[in-house]
Amino acid sequence: MIGELSAKYESNGGPGTISDGYGDPGGKSYGTYQLSSNAGSLEEFVEWLIDNGYWFGNELNKYYLTSPEFDSAWEWLANSANAQDFADAQHKYAIYAYYDPAVRSLRTAGFNIENHNDVMKDVVFSRSIQYGPGLIVEMFEEAVGYMGYPNLSYIDDVKFDYDLIVSVYLKVCSSLEWNNSAVREGVNARFRSECQDALDRL
């Protein structure tokens, strides 16, 4: 399923997960895909829930974001009879806000996701969750450069997926330009592990 890689490495699959935000410029992060409070994605998710008729959007909106009351409501939703609906809503939002925009941007740059393995779809999902859909083309074009091709249209075929996945994770995302966090080595360890998981599924 699209989202498996991101779910595993962002929160280990838990829709009720709340990070403490320590050392993270994104602040406290929530859910399966660790929606950032400081970057605005948490607030956008709550607004999306309300706009799309999810009653628990109004429930969360009763409280200040990141407050103890908000956190309690979030955890209750993830561990109650509504848990599956809450998890499904997080996934639908991630597709809407991250994956679909990334796919559209890549298509404009000559990379059509329907020409690739389902694992590549999961890679696009994961990279757009972590870095935002606005950087996906730059990331993939840089990866293509490491592969020795001038642009994405040259590798718009499933036969290039293995090498592209390696280049995205181990060349681009692991570079100092893309990963200069205080916990750089830990993040790079994630990239190595996630890359191998993706390759094993091809």
What is each of the regions a protein language model found here?
Residues 1-114, 119-202:
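Cell-wall polysaccharide-cleaving catalytic domain and substrate-binding groove, primarily
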